[in-house]
Curated annotation (Swiss-Prot):
<protein>
    <recommendedName>
        <fullName>Antiholin-like protein LrgB</fullName>
    </recommendedName>
</protein>
<feature type="transmembrane region" description="Helical">
    <location>
        <begin position="149"/>
        <end position="171"/>
    </location>
</feature>
<feature type="transmembrane region" description="Helical">
    <location>
        <begin position="91"/>
        <end position="113"/>
    </location>
</feature>
<comment type="function">
    <text>Inhibits the expression or activity of extracellular murein hydrolases by interacting, possibly with LrgA, with the holin-like protein CidA. The LrgAB and CidA proteins may affect the proton motive force of the membrane. May be involved in programmed cell death (PCD), possibly triggering PCD in response to antibiotics and environmental stresses.</text>
</comment>
<dbReference type="GO" id="GO:0031640">
    <property type="term" value="P:killing of cells of another organism"/>
</dbReference>
<keyword id="KW-1133">Transmembrane helix</keyword>
<keyword id="KW-0812">Transmembrane</keyword>
<keyword id="KW-0472">Membrane</keyword>
<keyword id="KW-1003">Cell membrane</keyword>
<keyword id="KW-0204">Cytolysis</keyword>
<feature type="transmembrane region" description="Helical">
    <location>
        <begin position="34"/>
        <end position="56"/>
    </location>
</feature>
<feature type="transmembrane region" description="Helical">
    <location>
        <begin position="7"/>
        <end position="24"/>
    </location>
</feature>
<dbReference type="InterPro" id="IPR007300">
    <property type="entry name" value="CidB/LrgB"/>
</dbReference>
<dbReference type="GO" id="GO:0012501">
    <property type="term" value="P:programmed cell death"/>
</dbReference>
<dbReference type="InterPro" id="IPR024891">
    <property type="entry name" value="Antiholin-like_LrgB"/>
</dbReference>
<comment type="similarity">
    <text>Belongs to the CidB/LrgB family. LrgB subfamily.</text>
</comment>
<dbReference type="GO" id="GO:0005886">
    <property type="term" value="C:plasma membrane"/>
</dbReference>
Amino acid sequence: MESTMSPYFGIVVSLAAFGIGTFLFKKTKGFFLFTPLFVAMVLGIAFLKIGGFSYADYNNGGEIIKFFLEPATIAFAIPLYKQRDKLKKYWWQIMASIIAGSICSVTIVYLLAKGIHLDSAVMKSMLPQAATTAIALPLSKGIGGISDITAFAVIFNAVIVYALGALFLKVFKVKNPISKGLALGTSGHALGVAVGIEMGEVEAAMASIAVVVVGVVTVLVIPVFVQLIGG
């Protein structure tokens, strides 16, 4: 059923929830459960449920926000352009690392889903989680997945990387800025880039190229796994 609610409703709810998440994240000095995106998601769902609003009421404005996903993804080219000298110098190492990481990500998700006997539709929904939302959602729909599950998987994956990515890099003593950026972008897409930006220009650029390449590799590799699932 279509909603007559103003698009501003969904936009205001999203911005307010994200603002609260940002405030809590800063106040708790980066406690991972208060990652802004995760808090915004929980608060948004709670607000709609308690207020008796439908998803259609929210999505009038949500679609406007969603429109900016593609331009935001393209904007990753800006930090990459600034570090094009490093891309030229280490291009094959960079590409090999991203491709290997992408394939490993999809393979691990497939094996885990297979191991716990998930339904085929759910498995297909989980496979694109390594790609950014702008790529993962249409890809999931195209292979017979469930977009809502894919969206949750992508966001959950990104939240984990945003909250704990820097910590994991320290634990595994990753010090090279190129390696840091590639790891963040390959595992955490857009929010991985956000962490990279906080670290430096090189990390941001490498994370950006990782997001783009992971998207391409995911699109090429997933049909193989869909055949294994039986689809």
